[in-house]
Amino acid sequence: MDFNPDVSELNAFRGTFQFASVDEPFELLNGQKLDDGILAYETYGELNENRDNAILVFHALSGSQHAAGYRESVSRSVDPLWTDECKKGWWDGFIGKNKVIDTSRHFLICANYVGGCYGSTGPTSNKANSEDKYMSSFPWVSMEDLVRSQMKLIDSLQIKELHAVVGASLGGLLALTTMLLFPQRTRSLVSIASGLKIQPLQVIHNFEQVKAIENDI
């Protein structure tokens, strides 16, 4: 299996990029509300007639909805952040025809999280009815908020039950959270690199990530 296909091969396989609204206002677990909740997402493959072949893939903390293929740009507001690293799908080696997540059999959905910066409502988005960006005033979001917002997307696609939820790192924890919150809507779970306990070194790395985000905004 080629884990480093060239751009011409990636262009032959690309997802469908779309935006979806979550409930307005979308109420967060802490009681705060988002009046303009938008999710940027990509889909791969075809949803079957029974609408029961869908797989929801959660990306890692700094990932995007672009899980596979090649996408040169997203939108005018996102493109300044859409570096060369973003253009190539982060799981190309696993997603596609006859690959681990076989898009000839399954319909794959991957959405950028609320709080992300690749098209979904996040710190770099404008506040509702304003030219001002949220930046550090963006509400705190929990893993439950991220899962519930994505299940709103699943509802909008009229999918009652997911064939599987899949994710690695933060994405793996969100896959676990989905199974806990919506067990009746999830048949299978694949959670990678998301153990219940972590070593002190990982705590340090997480702290570094938090500080990098705080210093950036």
Where are the model-predicted features located?
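Ligand-binding pocket scaffold of soluble enzyme catalytic domains
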Residues: 1-217
